Regions:
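Acidic, glycine-rich loop-and-beta core segments that form the ion-binding/anion-interacting portion
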Residues: 194, 207-248
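Short, conserved, GDST-rich strand-edge loop motifs in beta-rich repeat architectures
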Residues: 144-170, 241-244
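Acidic, Gly/Ser/Thr-rich repeat motifs that build Ca2+-stabilized beta-propeller blades
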Residues: 1-150, 222-240, 287-326, 348-368
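Short, small-residue-rich loop/turn micro-motifs
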Residues: 145-147, 178, 191, 261
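Blade-edge beta-strand/turn elements of extracellular beta-propeller
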Residues: 6-22, 54-67, 103-124, 165-219, ...
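Extracellular protease catalytic domains of secreted zymogens
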Residues: 231-237, 242-249, 256-302
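Conserved hydrophobic/aromatic pocket- or pore-lining residues that grip, position, or stack substrates
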Residues: 133, 174, 243
Length: 369
């Protein structure tokens, strides 16, 4: 991997924000091809649509089933490619376990009675849930799962149980499954997964979970698949934020947590060896604290950011772009605008760029005059 470089903002705003609507603690937006609707994910447990004319409608209400303490809640939604009859959801249940479930989607409505549980991942604390979903072109489902959290004590060591490096648990991982049921199993294990020989369908099953695609992550709050690459914005501990980009054909990558934070050895983590390098990292300086991913701006985004990865930071609310260059590898440039309590940046209808704020706003990013 090439080295990354920080490029200062020019001081001129590259984007401006246009408010599209107000929701209850929105944390993400998803879309479907050839569908003008935006599907707004509310942390409190509801999925709502936002039409071009501003009309809103609730299509799924899980508020009675979802724990919303701290970072818990309804976390992510994804539509499988080429299938308009199903929808996939992650949320934290009443005791905080991370649920990955499927619902039938008909007539622009989700029937809660059709819920089918794929995974229930026990989670010991109310933070570092991850929960982000993404499909690849073959219909395989990727799930970003946090390390289990629990870092509230002063001087506490991150990932105390070293879950992210433990291949017998799904915490601190990117999970990859084929969500189609097979016999008594709720899903299938892709044969190309790195630890597929550990599958319970294999009589010689070992202790490594076959659902694991990659590991060594702290809190992959947002993941994104674009042009055959998986982007992972992994929230750091106390010093560094990192962005990872990996071909989906590259299985079994270890991103290093808690052996290291970003590219730097982490206390008590041992000597880092054979780890997959982040393409970019930035320090906790100037008030920055947590990376918020993130999407690749397409040609129809309506901005000059085409081909760049657009992301932000929770504490500063600043928007940034990451661009690959021949001379420096990856360069970050500030985009001028800010949004308090930024929770996501994603692709909207027609390739537009959409941002959400926990304060309630859903915004479109547009080129500044």
């Amino acid at each position: 991997m090439t080295h990354s470089a920080l490029a200062p903002s020019t001081g001129k705003a590259a984007v401006q924000l246009t408010r599209l609507g107000t929701f209850e603690q929105p944390i993400g937006v998803v879309t479907r091809p050839d569908d003008p609707l935006m599907y707004v994910i509310e942390k409190t447990g509801r999925l709502k649509t936002l039409a071009p004319d501003g009309a809103r409608r609730t299509v799924l209400d899980l508020s009675k089933n979802v724990s919303t303490q701290n970072e818990r809640g309804l976390l992510s939604v994804a539509f499988p490619p080429g299938d308009r009859s199903r929808i996939y959801v992650t949320y934290t249940d009443s005791v905080g376990a991370l649920m990955v479930t499927e619902f039938a989607y008909t007539d622009a409505q989700v029937d809660p009675a059709t819920e089918r549980v794929l995974l229930r991942i026990p989670h010991p604390n109310d933070d570092h849930n991850g929960g982000s979903l993404a499909f690849d072109a073959d219909g395989l489902l990727y799930v970003g799962v946090g390390d289990g959290g629990g870092v509230g004590t002063r001087g506490g060591v991150g990932d105390r149980n070293n879950n992210a490096q433990n291949l017998n648990v799904l915490l601190g991982k990117i999970v990859r499954i084929d969500p189609r049921p097979m016999g008594d199993y709720a899903y299938r294990i892709p044969p190309s997964n790195p630890f597929v020989k550990s599958s319970p369908l294999n009589p010689r099953a070992g202790k490594r979970r076959p659902e694991i695609f990659a590991y060594g992550l702290r809190n992959p709050w947002r993941i994104r698949i674009d042009d055959g690459y998986l982007w992972i914005a992994d929230v750091g501990q106390s010093s560094w934020e990192e962005i990872n980009r990996i071909p989906i054909t590259r299985i079994g990558a270890n991103f290093g947590w808690r052996l290291r934070e970003g590219k730097h050895a982490y206390r008590g983590g041992g000597k880092p060896r054979g780890l997959f390098e982040p393409i970019f990292e930035y320090p906790h300086s100037d008030g920055r604290c947590a990376v918020i991913g993130g999407t690749v701006a397409g040609s129809s985004s309506g901005t000059e950011l085409v081909g760049t990865y657009v992301f932000g930071d929770l504490c500063t609310g600043r928007f940034m772009q990451l661009r690959q260059t021949d001379s420096t590898g990856w360069t970050m440039t500030g985009l001028g605008s800010r949004l308090a309590y930024l929770t996501s940046i994603s692709s909207g209808p027609g390739g537009s760029l959409i941002a959400t704020s926990l304060n309630g706003g859903v915004y479109r990013l547009e080129s500044a005059d």
